[in-house]
C-alpha cells in the first residue's frame, strides 16, 4: 500500500469571514481533484481555482509554531487568530463547542491551548483546514497574536520537499490495540458475548468463560458454585492471539473490528481507563536504523540515548527503527498517525543518512584524532603525515606500502600516513574497527603489533567487506535498549551470578573489550522486536518459547522443568533481549558469540524431584506431575464453544436474617463464604425450594431453635 500525503488548506479571511485567499498546500505540487479537501473546497466553498503551493504544514508543530509558519506563509506581520470549522485549535470552550472568532463569543469561558497539531486536530493526517483571520477584523482583537517563524522549521520543510519525489512510501501495516475500558457487562453481558461468538464464527474463534480469584482458577467439580469470585471471558483468534478479555467490570480490547461486530444488540457502556496502539510497519525499501540528525528537529522528534529509538515531541509516541520495519506505539488512537510518522522517518532517513560518509578524516579536529587513537605523552599512537614513499618500500595494495621498518597508508585524498614512534613501540599502521563498522571510515592509528591479520585491515587495505553485524567491542551499561551490533552488561546482581570467577580485560580508561575467554553479556534478539508489557505477557511468552526470562530481579521459568530450553532472555524497557557469552582474543578484532551457560540459572528452578500433591478437592488434584481429575491427567483444551448455563442457587433474605445472630459468633478466614455454604446446606437438608415453599420460617424454628444457637 502506497501512502499518499494528503493536501492541506489554508483559508485567509477578512471581516465578516469573507475569504481573501485560498492556499492549497501539497508536497506533490499539483491539484488532486479526487481528494476530500478539493471536494470540500469546490462543493461547500464553491472555489475551484485555489493558489497551489508546494508546501507542507508539519502536523507535529505546536500551535505557537504553527502561527509563526502561517504568518510566514501568508507574508503578514499583524496579529492573527487561527481556527477551524472541524476542530478547536488555538481557543476552545469548556463544553468543547467549536470556536469561531466571527460568532458571538463568551470571552470568560475561552481556554487557550498550545498543544500539538495532531493531538488537537485528530483528523489532520487526512483532512486539515485552517482558517486565518486578522485579529482586528474580529470582535476579540485582544485574543490575537503574532509569532515569528522558527527558521529550522522552514529549513526542514525545504529539505523535505527536495527529497520528496524520491521517497518510497510503500508500506504494509499491522496493528494491535491495547484498550482497557470500564464496562457494565457483568455476567449477563458475558453470556451474550459467548453466544454471539459461537454464532458468528465458532470454528475460528476460541472463547473461554471461567471463574477465578487472584490466586488460581477454581474448577468447581460437583460442588455448588459460590459466586463471590470474578468471572473472566477470554477470546482468541485463529492464530492464538487474545482479541479481547473481560471480567465483567473492565474489558481489554486488542481486536476492535471483532469486538464492535459483537455489540449490535448489546447495550454496553464503556469508559476508557487506558489505551494505546502498537503498529508494525513493513517497508518496501530498507532504511538506516541509526538516525543521526544534522539540523534542529525538536519540533518533530526527541532523540534518545539509543539511536534507533525516537520519541514524538510530546513524548507520547515512541518509534523503534529497524532496517526493514518500524514499530510505533501511540498512547491514544489517532487516524493514520502511524503512516504520517513513517513518512517523516523515511524522509529524514533520506535527508540525513544517505550522505557520503567516507569523508577525509584529516578534516576532523587534531585533538579529537589524538583522543580516539588514545595518543598520550608516552604512547605515540596518532600517525603522522609523510610526503613521500621510501625507495625500498614494496606495494601491498594500491593504498598500502611497507618496508622492514616502516608502513604507509594512503587515503582516498592521496594523504600518506605512517607510524614513526620515537620510542620505537607503536610502529604498525592499523585502523579503528568501530569507525569502519559504523561509517565505513578507515581511521589510521598506530599499534604495538602487526594488524594485517584483522578484518578491518583487510577491508581498508584490500577492500574485503566484513560482516555488517559484527559486535562492537564497547560494552554499554545495563538499562538501555541494545541495538543489533552492540552488547551491554547484565544487571549487577546477575552479572555477579553469571560471571563469577570469569576474567575480562578492558582497554585502558574505557569499557572496550580487549580479551575474555567467556563473559555473559546482553545483546538484541536476532528475531523481530518483541514487547512484553504485562506479567501475563511474560508468562505467556515464557511458556510458549519454553526458555528462561529475567525481568528486573525475577526469573521466570516455563511451567514444566523438562521443557526448559537453552536460551536465556532478559527484559529491558519491555523489549526482549538475549543473554549470550562473548569471547575475544587480544590479537583479534572478532568477538565470538556463544550460547549462555543456561544450566547456572536452570538449576535455580524450584522443582520437586518426588511426586507431591499440592492441593486436592472434589476429585481434582493438583500435583507436581500435573493436574488430575479422578486420578487421570486432565489435558482437555478448555473451551466455551458448548455452554450450558444453570440457575444460581440463591439464599432468601428470611434465611440469612434468621441465622444472623448465630453468624456473629463465627470467626473464619472467609466469613461470607462460610455463611453461603451454611445457608445452602441448610436449604438442601430441609428440602427447601423457594419456588414452591415461601413460608420457611416454621421449619427453621422447628429444626434450628433460637436462631440455630441451640439444636
Swiss-Prot record:
Protein name per the record: Early transcription factor 82 kDa subunit
Family: Belongs to the poxviridae VETF large subunit family.
Function per UniProt: Acts with RNA polymerase to initiate transcription from early gene promoters. Is recruited by the RPO-associated protein of 94 kDa (RAP94) to form the early transcription complex, which also contains the core RNA polymerase. ETF heterodimer binds to early gene promoters.
InterPro entries: Poxvirus_early-TF_lsu (IPR007532)
A GO biological process held by the record: positive regulation of DNA-templated transcription
UniProt keyword terms in alphabetical order: Activator, DNA-binding, Transcription, Transcription regulation
Keyword field contains DNA-binding: yes
GO terms of molecular function: DNA binding
Protein source organism: Rabbit fibroma virus (strain Kasza) (RFV)
Assembly information from the UniProt record: Heterodimer of a 70 kDa and a 82 kDa subunit. Part of the early transcription complex composed of ETF, RAP94, and the DNA-directed RNA polymerase.
Amino acid at each position: 500500500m502506497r501512502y499518499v500525503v494528503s493536501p492541506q488548506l489554508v483559508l485567509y479571511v477578512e471581516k465578516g469571514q469573507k475569504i481573501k485567499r485560498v492556499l492549497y498546500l501539497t508536497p506533490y505540487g499539483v491539484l488532486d481533484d479526487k481528494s476530500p479537501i478539493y471536494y470540500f473546497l469546490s462543493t461547500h466553498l464553491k472555489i475551484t481555482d485555489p493558489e497551489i503551493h508546494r508546501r507542507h504544514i508539519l502536523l507535529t508543530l505546536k500551535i505557537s509554531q504553527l502561527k509563526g509558519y502561517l504568518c510566514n506563509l501568508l507574508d503578514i506581520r499583524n496579529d492573527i487568530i487561527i481556527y477551524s470549522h472541524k476542530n478547536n485549535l488555538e481557543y476552545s470552550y469548556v463544553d468543547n463547542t467549536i470556536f469561531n472568532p466571527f460568532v458571538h463569543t463568551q470571552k470568560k469561558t475561552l481556554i487557550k491551548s498550545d498543544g500539538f497539531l495532531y493531538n488537537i486536530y485528530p483528523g489532520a493526517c487526512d483532512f486539515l483546514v485552517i482558517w486565518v483571520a486578522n485579529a482586528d477584523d474580529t470582535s476579540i482583537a485582544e485574543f490575537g497574536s503574532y509569532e515569528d517563524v522558527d527558521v529550522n522549521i522552514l529549513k526542514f520543510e525545504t529539505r523535505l520537499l527536495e527529497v520528496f519525489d524520491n521517497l518510497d512510501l510503500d508500506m504494509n501495516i499491522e496493528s494491535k490495540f491495547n484498550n482497557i475500558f470500564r464496562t457494565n457487562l457483568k455476567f449477563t453481558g458475558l453470556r451474550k458475548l459467548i453466544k454471539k461468538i459461537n454464532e458468528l464464527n465458532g470454528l475460528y474463534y476460541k472463547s473461554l468463560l471461567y471463574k477465578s480469584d487472584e490466586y488460581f482458577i477454581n474448577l468447581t467439580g460437583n460442588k455448588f458454585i459460590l459466586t463471590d469470585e470474578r468471572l473472566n471471558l477470554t477470546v482468541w483468534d485463529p492464530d492464538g492471539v487474545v482479541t479481547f478479555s473481560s471480567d465483567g467490570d473492565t474489558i481489554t480490547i486488542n481486536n476492535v473490528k471483532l469486538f464492535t461486530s459483537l455489540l449490535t444488540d448489546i447495550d454496553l457502556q464503556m469508559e476508557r481507563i487506558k489505551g494505546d496502539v502498537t503498529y508494525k510497519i513493513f517497508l518496501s525499501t530498507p532504511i538506516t536504523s541509526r538516525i543521526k540528525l544534522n539540523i534542529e528537529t525538536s519540533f518533530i522528534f526527541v532523540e534518545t540515548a539509543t539511536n534507533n529509538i525516537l520519541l514524538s515531541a510530546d513524548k507520547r509516541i515512541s518509534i523503534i527503527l529497524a532496517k526493514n520495519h518500524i514499530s510505533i506505539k501511540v498512547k491514544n488512537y489517532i487516524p493514520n498517525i502511524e503512516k504520517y510518522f513513517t513518512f517523516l522517518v523515511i524522509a529524514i532517513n533520506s535527508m540525513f543518512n544517505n550522505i557520503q560518509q567516507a569523508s577525509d578524516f584529516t578534516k576532523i579536529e587534531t585533538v579529537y584524532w589524538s583522543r580516539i587513537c588514545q595518543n598520550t605523552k608516552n604512547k605515540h599512537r596518532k600517525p603522522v603525515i609523510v610526503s613521500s614513499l621510501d625507495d625500498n618500500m614494496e606495494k601491498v595494495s594500491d593504498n598500502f606500502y611497507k618496508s622492514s621498518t616502516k608502513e604507509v597508508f594512503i587515503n582516498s585524498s592521496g594523504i600518506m600516513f605512517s607510524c614513526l614512534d620515537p620510542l620505537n613501540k607503536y610502529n604498525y599502521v592499523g585502523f579503528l574497527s568501530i569507525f569502519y563498522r559504523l561509517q565505513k571510515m578507515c581511521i589510521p592509528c598506530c599499534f604495538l603489533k602487526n594488524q594485517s591479520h584483522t578484518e578491518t585491515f583487510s577491508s581498508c587495505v584490500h577492500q574485503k567487506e566484513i560482516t555488517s553485524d559484527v559486535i562492537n567491542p564497547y560494552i554499554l551499561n545495563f538499562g538501555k535498549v541494545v541495538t543489533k551490533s552492540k552488547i551491554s552488561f547484565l544487571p549487577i546482581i546477575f552479572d555477579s551470578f553469571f560471571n563469577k570467577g570469569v576474567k575480562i580485560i578492558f582497554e585502558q580508561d574505557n569499557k572496550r573489550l580487549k580479551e575474555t575467554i567467556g563473559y555473559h553479556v546482553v545483546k538484541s534478539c536476532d528475531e523481530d522486536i518483541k514487547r512484553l508489557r504485562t506479567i501475563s505477557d511474560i508468562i505467556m511468552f515464557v511458556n510458549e518459547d519454553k526458555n528462561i526470562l529475567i525481568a528486573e530481579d525475577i526469573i521466570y521459568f516455563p511451567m514444566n522443568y523438562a521443557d526448559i530450553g537453552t536460551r536465556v532472555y532478559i527484559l529491558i524497557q519491555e523489549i526482549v533481549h538475549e543473554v549470550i557469552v562473548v569471547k575475544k582474543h587480544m590479537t583479534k578484532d572478532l568477538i565470538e558469540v556463544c550460547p549462555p551457560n543456561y544450566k547456572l540459572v536452570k538449576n535455580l528452578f524450584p522443582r520437586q524431584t518426588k511426586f507431591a500433591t499440592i492441593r486436592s478437592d472434589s476429585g481434582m488434584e493438583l500435583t507436581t506431575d500435573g493436574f488430575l481429575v479422578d486420578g487421570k491427567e486432565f489435558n482437555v483444551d478448555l473451551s466455551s464453544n458448548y455452554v450450558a448455563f444453570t440457575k444460581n442457587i440463591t439464599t432468601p433474605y428470611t434465611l440469612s436474617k434468621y441465622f444472623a445472630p448465630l453468624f456473629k459468633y463465627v470467626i473464619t478466614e472467609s466469613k461470607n463464604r462460610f455463611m453461603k455454604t451454611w445457608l445452602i446446606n441448610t436449604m438442601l437438608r430441609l428440602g427447601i425450594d423457594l419456588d414452591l415453599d415461601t413460608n420457611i420460617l416454621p421449619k427453621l424454628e422447628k429444626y434450628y431453635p433460637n436462631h440455630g444457637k441451640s439444636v
